[in-house]
Swiss-Prot record:
Organism whose genome encodes this protein: Campylobacter jejuni (strain RM1221)
Keywords: Cytoplasm, Glycolysis, Lyase, Magnesium, Metal-binding, Secreted
Protein name as catalogued: Enolase
Residues annotated for Mg(2+) binding in this entry: D239, E280, D307
Keyword check for NAD: no
Gene name of this polypeptide: eno
Protein's GO biological process: glycolytic process
Length: 414
C-alpha cells in the first residue's frame, strides 16, 4: 500500500489572470501528482462554494484561505491515507468540511487535492490517468462540442446566448473530427473580418463580435460549415445560459421579454430551421415547470443539457430524472468538489440513459485533467472551448495523445 506522504498547495493564475489553487500530492514511493482547479463565470446558485479571500489582493479574488485549508486542515487529516482508495480520500474531505457545499474548506481546496491524488496514484502505477480512473473499459474518444462564437457572460458583446458550438459527428477518428473544427474556425475568422466584424476572442477562445441577434451567429456557422465542405457531418449546439437573462419570471433578450412558452417555441423554430443537436440551459435553473415543458416538446428530438439546472450534483440530478427534466447533464468537477462525487453523478446519469458532457470552465489553466476524465468515464462528449488559447488546446492535444492508445471515436454512434 502506498500512502499520502505530503500535501501542499499554492496560488497560480487561471486564464483570466485570477488566482486559483494548485495542489501537489506526494506518495510514500516518491510519486507526485499535481492539479490546477478551474473557475466559472456563469455559475449555478447551487454549485459547491469556490472560496475566495475577499480582501484587497487581486480585487478580492485571492485564494490564500483555500491554500491554507489544504496546507493545514486537509493535510493534517489525510496524511497516511491509502492513495489508491479515492473514495476514502474524497469521503474524508467531505466529512472534514462538514457542509453539503464545501463552504468551510472551499471546493477549490478539496477538488485540487482530489485530482492531485488521483494523478499521483496513476503515476505510481505507471498508468495514464484515464486508464487508472476508468479501468479496462475506458476507451471512447469524446465528440468535441467546440464553442467558436462566444456571447453572454463569456464575452463583452451584445449577444445573449452564451455559446454557439459545432459538433463534428460524421468522422471515424478524433483527429479528423478536430481537423474539421480547425478548418471551420479559420473560415469563420475570415468571414468575420471580411464583413467588418471584430475577431477579438472571448474567455473560451471563440470569437466575440457584436451581431444583430441570437440567430445571426447560427447563420454564420452554417455558412462556414458549408464553405469548409462539412455539411451533414458537423452539427450545431447551443449553450443559452438563460439564467443569466431571467428576471421577474421573464427571459429578457434582444430587447424583449419572453415567457417560458415563448422561448420554447423559439427553440422549436430554430431546431426546425437548423441542424441543432443540443441545447444547454435553455431555461433558467429554477424554472422547473418550463424545463418539464421543454423536455416534453424537444426531448425526443435533440439533447437538452442541464448545467445550472443540475450542477453536477447527484441528488439534484436524481430529482430532475424523476420529474423528467432535460435528458443530459453537464459534468463540471468543480461544481461538486471531488472526483468521487463527480463519478457518482455520471454513473447515475448513465444508469438512467441521460447523456453526459464533460466540461471545462471559462476560467481555465493548462491542466488537461478533464480530457482523461472524459475518456475514463466514457462520457462521449466534451466541452473545452475553441481551438485557440493554450488552456483550451491543452485538452484537445491531450485527447490526441490518448487517441494514439485508444482510437474509438464515438462520432455518429453518439
Amino acid at each position: 500500500m502506498l500512502v499520502i506522504e505530503d500535501v501542499r498547495a499554492y496560488e497560480v493564475l487561471d486564464s483570466r489572470g485570477n488566482p486559483t489553487v494548485k495542489a501537489e500530492v506526494t506518495l510514500s514511493d516518491g510519486s507526485v501528482g499535481a492539479a490546477i482547479v478551474p473557475s466559472g463565470a456563469s455559475t449555478g446558485s447551487k454549485e459547491a462554494l469556490e472560496l475566495r479571500d475577499n480582501d484587497e489582493r487581486f480585487g478580492g479574488k485571492g485564494v490564500l484561505k483555500a491554500v491554507a485549508n489544504v496546507n493545514e486542515t486537509i493535510a493534517d487529516e489525510i496524511l497516511g491515507l491509502d492513495a489508491f482508495n479515492q473514495t476514502q480520500l474524497d469521503d474524508t474531505l467531505r466529512e472534514l468540511d462538514g457542509t453539503n457545499n464545501y463552504s468551510n474548506l472551499g471546493a477549490n481546496a478539496t477538488l485540487g487535492v482530489s485530482m492531485a491524488t488521483a494523478r499521483a496514484a496513476a503515476a505510481a502505477l505507471g498508468m495514464p490517468l484515464y486508464r487508472y480512473l476508468g479501468g479496462a473499459n475506458a476507451s471512447i474518444l469524446p465528440v468535441p462540442m467546440c464553442n467558436i462564437i462566444n456571447g453572454g457572460a463569456h464575452a463583452n458583446n451584445n449577444v445573449d446566448f452564451q455559446e454557439f458550438m459545432i459538433m463534428p459527428f460524421g468522422f471515424t477518428s478524433f483527429k479528423e473530427a478536430l481537423r474539421s473544427v480547425c478548418e471551420i474556425y479559420v473560415i469563420l475568422k475570415k468571414e468575420l473580418a471580411n464583413s467588418g466584424h471584430s475577431t477579438a476572442l472571448g474567455d473560451e477562445g471563440g470569437f466575440a463580435p457584436n451581431l444583430a441577434n441570437n440567430t445571426e451567429p447560427i447563420d454564420l456557422l452554417m455558412t462556414c460549415i458549408k464553405k469548409a465542405g462539412y455539411e451533414n457531418r458537423v452539427k450545431i449546439a447551443l449553450d443559452v445560459a438563460s439564467t443569466e437573462f431571467f428576471k421577474d419570471g421573464k427571459y429578457h433578450m434582444e430587447g424583449k421579454a419572453f415567457s417560458s412558452e415563448d422561448l420554447i417555441e423559439r427553440y422549436v423554430e430554430l431546431c426546425a430551421k437548423y441542424p441543432i443537436c443540443s441545447i444547454e440551459d435553455g431555461l433558467a435553473e429554477n424554472d422547473f415547470e418550463g424545463w418539464i415543458k421543454l423536455t416534453e416538446k424537444l426531448g425526443n428530438k435533440i439533447q437538452l443539457v442541464g448545467d445550472d439546472l443540475f450542477v453536477t450534483n447527484e441528488d439534484i440530478l436524481r430529482e430532475g430524472i424523476i420529474k423528467k427534466m432535460a435528458n443530459a447533464v453537464l459534468i463540471k468537477p468543480n461544481q461538486i468538489g471531488t472526483i468521487t462525487q463527480t463519478m457518482r453523478t455520471v454513473r447515475l446519469a448513465q444508469r438512467n440513459n441521460y447523456k453526459c458532457v464533460m466540461s471545462h470552465r471559462s476560467g481555465e489553466s493548462e491542466d488537461a485533467f478533464i480530457a482523461d476524465f472524459a475518456v475514463a468515464l466514457n462520457t462521449g462528449q466534451i466541452k473545452t472551448g475553441a481551438l485557440a488559447r493554450g488552456e483550451r488546446t491543452a485538452k484537445y492535444n491531450r485527447l490526441l495523445e490518448i487517441e494514439l492508445e485508444s482510437d474509438e471515436y464515438l462520432g455518429e454512434k453518439l
